[in-house]
């Protein structure tokens, strides 16, 4: 896989200067972008409702994690949508479908979803986009992929703490990069490790 160091924001600027013909992008990549957009849109809505459920059950710290992840997934969805629209592809409105259960079950569902995205879905999408030199899609996919890996670890940790009765020891603050959705627990560096966005612009969930 080629190393992609360009920032998403810079890529958008380049697109304005030299628009891309959507006919030059393969159907497989546009289909993957559509699927990723649908998945991230659903995850964002689902996690927002999971956060409300966690609050009702008295798990304030887990609610914060769900809120942070929801914002991150919304950013991923917007990035995928931006690439599709730049390519001249119509993006249909998504009506998310999911079921809210207990916080424990919701965490298990989140772990399953993040596990699929970080081990199967995004690696496959990235491989295809890389082979097709679909650089903008590749950047957007990589942002989501690396963030979902972090979300998977955070959710697994939260479930472990919940099962052991230590939920209150979880982090009480999360930072989310508005450019790529990268999520930091407790504290964050001066700049995002993925997009190099300044910490001053990060979303804070506490």
PLM region spans:
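N-terminal export/membrane-targeting signals
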Residues: 1-22
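Non-heme di-metal
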Residues: 21-206
